[in-house]
Each structure stands twice: as structure tokens, then as C-alpha cells.
Amino acid sequence: MTAHEVNFDGLVGLTHHYAGLSFGNEASTRHRFQMSNPRLAVKQGLLKMKALADAGFPQAVIPPHERPFIPALRQLGFTGSDEQILDKVARQAPRWLSSVSSASPMWVANAATVCPSADALDGKVHLTVANLNNKFHRALEAPVTEALLRAIFRDESQFSVHSALPQVALLGDEGAANHNRLGGEYGSAGVQLFVYGREEENEIRPARYPARQSREASEAVARLNQVNPQQVIFAQQNPEVIDQGVFHNDVIAVSNRQVLFCHEAAFARQKVLINQLRTRVDGFMAIEVPAGEVSVSDAVATYLFNSQLLSRDDGSMLLVLPRECQDHVGVWRYLNKLVAEDNPISAMQVFDLRESMANGGGPACLRLRVVLTEEERRAVNPAVMMNDALFTALNAWADRYYRDRLTAADLADPLLLREGREALDVLTRLLDLGSVYPFQQTGAADG
């Protein structure tokens, strides 16, 4: 059956700021306390979406979350009206305020893991929400992510959205950032590659930075998504590259159809994995980048592998890259050599995503890949699909509500909370989502 890959990109939230919350993510740590520009950030993302949609790659949007997230502060023991809580936490525990104000939901590669209908035992599209329990600020996301996905993929005859795994370290799940699908045509059955950093009985794990994804979680997600067991491979990421800042597999590898583009040091037992894929995937091609041409540290600094690999109608592939790749002499030299060689990657497109990149999120972090047949695509909430009208409306919305500068100190401003809630109220109507945010369901206690 004919199917296409649709990229659902996350909209950057109104509280996008640099707080260094993500240990193991070196860009996040390096840019801590710098001033951010939320309006520029959301527009950089919108420009990427629109440019790819105009080039014929189907695009859709996933909204940001409610931030600052007052319910989490109430769970931590802060009391009073919303405004009183903001004041208390800013004075007593400002790091908590930064955590509950993180715009990290924009990196929707961590929102869920997706199984196309061609791979599922029941013939439906499955999405399992990620629990993201390695980081407090990200562990807050799962309930609202689930509500948003149910509002977008609302036809239960076509889609099954599964709640996140239990919030325990044993079942740490980071979503599609640790998942690849390889095969021929999108509508044909493929091989799903689940990548983990640790497993309970295995002493091979990183020493410096945490391995966020467990094998136990990957296996549970594969079961929930009803992936045909004959179409699954579980592989461990190289713990040495995790210790060099490769906190998700999509920082060191990206796949599309029959191509796996990765660093030569991406996986533990990489030769064994490549041979498995060669046996299981017709026409499989591994493009392994040697350390002599691009070091792991340069790959992390430029996010070379946090790129999007997209199929064009003629069968060739487009590599969507952050500007940092173009700015790095060695990486750019390698990329120009790559597209001149005999392989499906024949073109590159560079985007300025510096606001997201400074927090450790490149082009691939900002999108969730969902393979859909035409019938399934028609069943998606049409209001989230990117087109000229939505692009214009979202830019006007951003101009109205987003600030052009934000620091950690600004997060205590009660006006920012009110601006955010008003913006999300408007957005849910624009995208026909219903009342998906807690403040819409309970009413806001502004005091």
C-alpha cells in the first residue's frame, strides 16, 4: 500500500530559555544562563516546516506545553495562588521554576515511538508516549503529550495512542530519538531498530553521562506498538559515545528507508548490527562516517547526524542539516564529498536553528516521523497540517504572544504565565484540539 512519511514538528514554547537542565547534553550545559529569543526560536522552526512542506515533504505541527507548569510546583509543596507560587519558588528554589518552565516539549522526537500500520500486528498506526524519566523537566511532559497526540490522531479505527511506561528508571524511555525504521517503500513492512544505552543485567554502560534508554523499555514499547516480533532488532548504543555527549541515538545516527547514516563508533558491536541489517533489509546501505573524517566530538558539536534524511520522488534523498554543519570546515568538506559519491544522498539543505541548537536540539530533535497511508492521513486532524494559511496564522500568533528576549529571571513574571495561557487558548482553537491543557480543564487560579 502506498504511504508517505509525515514529519510532525514541535512548536517552540513561549518560555524557551537556557537553563542547562540536561546533564549529558553538552550544548545545554554550555549555553546555561544565556539570553534566549523565543520569538526567533519559534520562527526558525516554522521556516523549516514551511520550506520542507513547499518542497513536497508533508509537514504538520505539534503544539507546545503549558509553561510554567504550576501543577508540578504544587506537587512540590508550594501553595497559594498561581502568582504567589511563582513568587515563592523564584525566591526559595529558582531551579524548580526553570525546570517547570522548560520548553523541552518542542523536541518531539522524544514525544513518542511510532509504529506504522505496515509493521503492526493489528494493522493500525501505534504511538507510545515516552516517559522521559531521566530528567525531571522532561518527565513532566507525558500526560499532556498524550492528550495532544489523542487530539491529533483521534480516529481510533486508524490510530492507537498508548500511555507512557511506568515512571521508574528501569523503564526509561526517550521515544523516537532512540528508534529507527529501515526498509523499502514506506508502505511496505520494515525493520524497526530500537537502540538502548543500558539493560539491567549488563554491566556495559557509560561511566560519565547517564544512559537514558533501557532495553527493558524498548522491548515494552515494541510490545505496546504491536510490532511484528520478526521485524525488530534491539541494539546497544556505544557507551563511549554517550560519555562524549551522545545522549540520544539521533545525535550519532539517522536512517531513512534502506539507508543508515551513522558514525563508525555509533553502536556497540556495530559490525554485527550492520550484518544483521544487511540480511534483513533488501538493498540495505550503511554509510559509516570514519572518525578520521569527522570525530565524535565534531559530530556532537555540529549535530551532523541530528539531521533529517528525506526521500524525494525520484528515489534520491535530501539531508536537512543545521547551519553549524556548514560553519565547520571539516564537517562541510565531508558532506560535500558525501553527496558527490554514489549513494542515495544527493542533496543538502541547511537551516538556521541556532535557538534550538544552543539547547541541544537539531532538525531531527524537532520532528516526529509518522508513516501514513492516504486513508490514515485523511484521518489526522486536518488543522495541524502545514500549509500557507497555517504558516501565516502561526507567524501572526507568534508575533502577538512571544517575547523576543527571555532570561531565567523573567520566568517569575506572572504576566508571562498569563500570556502563555492566552496564547495556548488561541492555539487550541486554531488547531481544533479541544481543551488539552490542565489550565483549560480546571480553570487558572491566578489570585
Swiss-Prot record:
It catalyses: N(2)-succinyl-L-arginine + 2 H2O + 2 H(+) = N(2)-succinyl-L-ornithine + 2 NH4(+) + CO2. Keywords: Arginine metabolism, Hydrolase. GO terms for molecular function: N-succinylarginine dihydrolase activity. One of its GO terms (biological process) is arginine catabolic process to succinate. The active site is at residues 174, 248, 365. It is an enzyme of class 3 (hydrolase). HAMAP family: AstB. Catalyzes the hydrolysis of N(2)-succinylarginine into N(2)-succinylornithine, ammonia and CO(2). PANTHER family: N-SUCCINYLARGININE DIHYDROLASE. Homodimer. This is N-succinylarginine dihydrolase. It comes from Salmonella dublin (strain CT_02021853). The lineage of its organism: Bacteria, Pseudomonadati, Pseudomonadota, Gammaproteobacteria, Enterobacterales. The gene is astB.
